[in-house]
Amino acid sequence: MPYLGSEDVVKELKKALCNPHIQADRLRYRNVIQRVIRYMTQGLDMSGVFMEMVKASATVDIVQKKLVYLYMCTYAPLKPDLALLAINTLCKDCSDPNPMVRGLALRSMCSLRMPGVQEYIQQPILNGLRDKASYVRRVAVLGCAKMHNLHGDSEVDGALVNELYSLLRDQDPIVVVNCLRSLEEILKQEGGVVINKPIAHHLLNRMSKLDQWGQAEVLNFLLRYQPRSEEELFDILNLLDSFLKSSSPGVVMGATKLFLILAKMFPHVQTDVLVRVKGPLLAACSSESRELCFVALCHVRQILHSLPGHFSSHYKKFFCSYSEPHYIKLQKVEVLCELVNDENVQQVLEELRGYCTDVSADFAQAAIFAIGGIARTYTDQCVQILTELLGLRQEHITTVVVQTFRDLVWLCPQCTEAVCQALPGCEENIQDSEGKQALIWLLGVHGERIPNAPYVLEDFVENVKSETFPAVKMELLTALLRLFLSRPAECQDMLGRLLYYCIEEEKDMAVRDRGLFYYRLLLVGIDEVKRILCSPKSDPTLGLLEDPAERPVNSWASDFNTLVPVYGKAHWATISKCQGAERCDPELPKTSSFAASGPLIPEENKERVQELPDSGALMLVPNRQLTADYFEKTWLSLKVAHQQVLPWRGEFHPDTLQMALQVVNIQTIAMSRAGSRPWKAYLSAQDDTGCLFLTELLLEPGNSEMQISVKQNEARTETLNSFISVLETVIGTIEEIKS
């Protein structure tokens, strides 16, 4: 290993670099320098040969110079006493007759990250902007942006900006593109580079001479120009027409976006453009590059929001291949759902049916949900397939089919009879809470059509004590009461037993309150129960299942060829906000927003909870409520990221802890009653980047320590440590209140 005996290695290399016989042999000399670079990249400190490496730069060998420049840029900040020697060497090479040497030296100078280096690189950069060699001008233009970054918050050099604007007329196309990039960086605080009519027309005329990367860049900058007349607009569109046929997907997408933005007043032109890019998009969807394929599929879905069925004739292009990754398969299934019509429905359903038995449970469930979405239009065919899937008696398939049936009978009442005939016997293959809730809901609402409905619910009642999900218990209460109204003789006894358990023994307050509500409602009379439970009502989630209206192209044209179709508009806005602004300390809500009958937390302790230690990048989002089912599902799917114990003595009121947690935006999902043992609490919180923290607090009988278990949906050690710090502060504050 080179790390052992490193001093001997440095001495050996230093001796070799000073050997005149090696210096006389160019290949041997270069090989020694390559050894220095190799050891440097392996982590060995090679700063001891700095002087010898600077001397090695005095050569006509371009390869050797490049290696030495790499070394000097790496170690110059670590050797400030010798860095000036390196700068002088580079400045000298900036005047070398060879343009490759001049450009290489200038690029290396701009890469130095040292205080005060600006005064040394300014004049070489200005000279480079006027150099006859295009390669040197390319490097000098990019060096302007680097020099501006080194200056920090100093004022923008107007003369330098004017020089860069004049270089937009340069004969070298790469210099032009580099000028745009540098101006954008330098003028970032002023809104970026300004594209006026002369610049826009000049760039349009030079487009054919640019490489594909440059074309994509220029198309993005041209979005800032607004034509003055309709005639000018169509002249620009005619110039851009050929780029819709480019072999580069980036150029095609950039040209398409520019077309959509410029033609915002001409919907027929927008539609024609989207028809013309159908071929390139389909080719990208079949690309071997998985990243390109995924992004293309996201853009296809975006286009389908405005042009439903736009790709219907090419539906087979979206059939999934066995070797494709999971995320691409899910996108293709979503697209297939939107391409179904009378001509291809049978083929699409057969394809989706094959996916339902995929080895990936998540993909199989997504395919079943997709069939459920198609069932709103082609009900009979889809219900038949879903019924056949129930016969497979596989837990993950049965669970999703029952959930799909629940949504289907709600939206398509005509299929209720077929669904009710398919349900008997499926309860044996349902174990998770979502499937149980869906089945119980169906038995409660349509139990009069299902012969064994009371007996299935009776099994749930008998096992209610071992049921761990409060949402299942609440659904069971409602379903059994509904079924009691239509089949009272079979349900009266078990309803009484369930109400007794929920009121007298259940520890979850939400379940207990619902049991009390139904008990008191029954005391009022059956007519009142029917009026409340069986009255016509609309569910708030109905809007999620209805067909979304077609969106005009202009509503998403500005998001085309960006990451918005990939992340979603809201999520991307959050990411952009975090990238654009430095993280600030979390701003906690004021305690006055939480109403309480009495001071659960003394004012001095409230101030302590609010004045938490700096949590770095952590900023918990207020009012982030999770359902118990979602919490449970996520909790079971994640591994414990952190565990610890905190000292704990005596009793406390749970409301005190809940109040303190709310102050710091940590929500309580469920909590045991005061004094119960073991005592548990489940908490959730989410930061502004979407990282979710799920927490379990546990107090065992006779134990003087509180056990804390935290799970995280994204592995971020820094934010996890910040969250633990906040949690420790809250619990420590409550401990002081008790004492």
Swiss-Prot record:
Widely expressed. This is AP-4 complex subunit beta-1. The keyword Transmembrane does not apply. GO terms for molecular function: clathrin binding. Changing W635A: Decreased interaction with TEPSIN. Adaptor protein complex 4 (AP-4) is a heterotetramer composed of two large adaptins (epsilon-type subunit AP4E1 and beta-type subunit AP4B1), a medium adaptin (mu-type subunit AP4M1) and a small adaptin (sigma-type AP4S1). Interacts with TEPSIN; this interaction requires the presence of a functional AP-4 complex. Interacts with GRIA2; probably indirect it mediates the somatodendritic localization of GRIA2 in neurons. Residues 601-739 are annotated as: Ear. It is a peripheral membrane protein. Belongs to the adaptor complexes large subunit family. It comes from Homo sapiens (Human). It is linked to Spastic paraplegia 47, autosomal recessive: A form of spastic paraplegia, a neurodegenerative disorder characterized by a slow, gradual, progressive weakness and spasticity of the lower limbs. SPG47 is characterized by neonatal hypotonia that progresses to hypertonia and spasticity, and severe intellectual disability with poor or absent speech development. GO terms for biological process: intracellular protein transport; protein localization; protein localization to somatodendritic compartment; protein targeting; vesicle-mediated transport. InterPro entries: AP_beta (IPR026739), AP_complex_bsu_1_2_4 (IPR016342), ARM-like (IPR011989), ARM-type_fold (IPR016024), B-adaptin_app_sub_C (IPR015151), Clathrin/coatomer_adapt-like_N (IPR002553), TBP_dom_sf (IPR012295). One of its GO terms (cellular component) is cytoplasmic side of trans-Golgi network transport vesicle membrane. Component of the adaptor protein complex 4 (AP-4). Adaptor protein complexes are vesicle coat components involved both in vesicle formation and cargo selection. They control the vesicular transport of proteins in different trafficking pathways. AP-4 forms a non clathrin-associated coat on vesicles departing the trans-Golgi network (TGN) and may be involved in the targeting of proteins from the trans-Golgi network (TGN) to the endosomal-lysosomal system. The gene is AP4B1. Residues 534-600 are annotated as: Hinge. It is found in: Golgi apparatus, trans-Golgi network membrane. Keywords: Golgi apparatus, Hereditary spastic paraplegia, Membrane, Neurodegeneration, Protein transport, Transport.
